[in-house]
Swiss-Prot record:
Source species: Rhizobium etli (strain ATCC 51251 / DSM 11541 / JCM 21823 / NBRC 15573 / CFN 42)
The protein's required cofactors: Zn(2+)
Name of the protein: Alanine--tRNA ligase
Pfam families the UniProt entry points to: DHHA1 (PF02272), tRNA-synt_2c (PF01411), tRNA_SAD (PF07973)
GO biological process per UniProt: alanyl-tRNA aminoacylation; negative regulation of DNA-templated transcription
Amino acid sequence: MSGVNDIRSTFLDYFKKNGHEIVPSSPLVPRNDPTLMFTNAGMVQFKNVFTGLEKRPYATATTSQKCVRAGGKHNDLDNVGYTARHLTFFEMLGNFSFGDYFKENAIELAWKLVTEGFGLPKHRLLVTVYSEDEEAAALWKKIAGFSDDKIIRIPTSDNFWQMGDTGPCGPCSEIFIDQGENVWGGPPGSPEEDGDRFLEFWNLVFMQFEQTEPGVRNPLPRPSIDTGMGLERMACILQGVQSVFDTDLFRTLTGTIEDTIGVKAEGSASHRVIADHLRSSAFLIADGVLPSNEGRGYVLRRIMRRAMRHAQLLGAKEPLMYKLLPTLVQEMGRAYPELARAEALISETLKLEEGRFRKTLERGLSLLSDATADLDKGDMLDGETAFKLYDTYGFPLDLTQDALRAREIGVDIAGFTDAMQRQKAEARSHWAGSGEKATETIWFELREKHGATEFLGYDTEAAEGVVQAIVRDGAVAAEAKAGDKVQIVVNQTPFYGESGGQMGDAGVISSDHGKIEISDTQKRGEGLFVHLGTVIEGVVRDGDAVAMTVDHARRSRLRANHSATHLLHEALREVLGTHVAQKGSLVAPERLRFDVSHPKPMTPEELKIVEDMANEIVLQNSPVTTRLMSVDDAIAEGAMALFGEKYGDEVRVVSMGTGLHGAKSNKPYSVELCGGTHVSATGQIGLVRILGESAVGAGVRRLEAVTGESAREYLAEQDDRVKTLAASLKVQPSEVLSRVEALIDERRKLEKELADAKRKLAMGGGQGGSGDAVREVAGVKFLGKSISGVDPKDLKGLADEGKTSIGSGVVALIGVSEDGKASAVVAVTPDLVERYSAVDLVRIASVALGGKGGGGRPDMAQAGGPDGSKADEAIEAVALALAG
């Protein structure tokens, strides 16, 4: 019963038998809670229930909540691996009462589970209570039979919990276990309380007050209970170990690490770091977070890269973490099915990220090694170098700190921050501005004066209104004449203002005295629609009655493209997985662009399936419906909300199509919260044609597509190209592909023959081969040669051939490119690697070539330099080093 999975089941089953609803863990990304980076406690998903903003169909609940503490003020990242209990990912077991039972029942339930369910010896248990909470102290005496010395009164905030400056709050009672005299530490409240002897494992929070302002508390009419027990801590207690990394789950994970890389753990911090970071990385990815350079994605990247650096310390030569994932899924997939469902995505993300990072990790560590070569214990790495590691090599600051930890070398944090701020300031100085002439103050004042513009464009493309303001040359004007570029505000408009990725409408606004050609419509301030255009006839004045007509053809293309993004979004989620989320879009008249979260390039087959699924819904010609409802109702009905988008109390829900496959069969195909304009039936989209996909950043892919008339034009152009190509190749259009493939094969053969000829010439060719360049230095054969016209990437292969030809010795090859730069490769045969290091020798060559550095293995290393004219000097420098 002491295994992690058994403890979790025992806890949940116990409270279920006592009338509690088992509620699944909420995601690690809190919904509608911008105050939190990640879910870090069991009560997070019930916050609105405790405050009365949300009702649940149950009054008591129990959960095993996934939690992450990394980033923000709750950040345990730096300590993980070096202490017995710090983790970035942990599970919080909890039971909750929403105005149902209170202190007595909470204490009684906890006591019975601890002593009877988990079998902890009563004489080793003790509790803390808030110093003013006499009721809790009396209840512990009554229920547990504790004497006064087992009930420790704490007067500080450690035993009084509050959600914020205002809101529900109340005293806490924590349950501790005495781990014995052989463990250092004193009881809570004593000077030695930071020791490990007395271990807190369960916190009971009694929410009985409402704090209206600091220091002012009123009793709640329906007091509540919020408790939290660390699953990993309870596992330590029941398994009789001092470190969470010695519990069964972590022993299994570290055992897999040992088996995979062949290095025993034996107290290794690296094994512990990798095991913990694998858990947090996998669960974050399963909950929709992907590595990126900002926000939650950057925290995930920091966690992953820290683990990858420790894998490198253990000697891993290729990506490791994805190989450990099956063990994690086996151990935790039953309790958290989302982990098993997302296994393929997690594995691919881990593999790709580690593969990308390994390319720069060694170079960054080499720079770090050089920069700290002269530093001693207690010294500080300068902030400029730390920032260069961050900016150039992708080293998060904490990774640099961790790499120097064993040598007890610090990092100049202030210098790092200064370097980052200087870079930001320089970037700002190069920013040319948006070209917007009117200041935000003008739009704010107009919004205050006239209120929001009424949008009529969902129902009509033509309307009448009254001009409320004319802005010309950055200032409000009374009128505008032919030729003037203006920004017009009207009391109501059928013109859609750019938002949600959809471009603004164009068209014409005319009065009795003048006409304006509108090229764009933007939103300013809070709901102010601003029409940008040029007066093409007469005069337009403030206060004029005007007729407004939207460019119908342009609006129709925008509608088709916007509706197509919804169909593509849903198709992508069906084909790639539910981790796909919209990260940005551009809906223009001639095309659409759509950015989504996904860790790797899409295959041609996946793109074809996505396109086919979208066109299936187009061919249905089913009605596109819109409804207004509350955000909560919309999401409850399955509508997709865009992460980070702000929504009002009432939202517009756009539905289109009927699903034909799987879980979507005979259900609405696409349901999204959206304020844009759309077709009235999917058939009006005409055709969806994906042009391609590309990367716009780590973990984000971009699709580009065309619809309707643009798709027809694109296909016609493609057809013309194929016919022209067929004529050039003197074949039928249907034979173009096979003819091109034959030409490519022929070219490859010729290129290979040419490369082979160059290699032979480079090493001397013909008779004698490379022998002419071989000499003996200090009793060792030395093949030194300067080579032109050979691709630098072929130098290693030539060096291997050189080693084979001389049998035993050292090979130094300098390749000189057309621009005069040089590449150097040094190879040492196996029998001489104890005597000579290829890395040392190639660095000598690099210095002679005007470069510095270089790296590789003792038997093969490479470097470069800007001055290829010094190739012979570089070879002689290596020979001189051999001579000693």
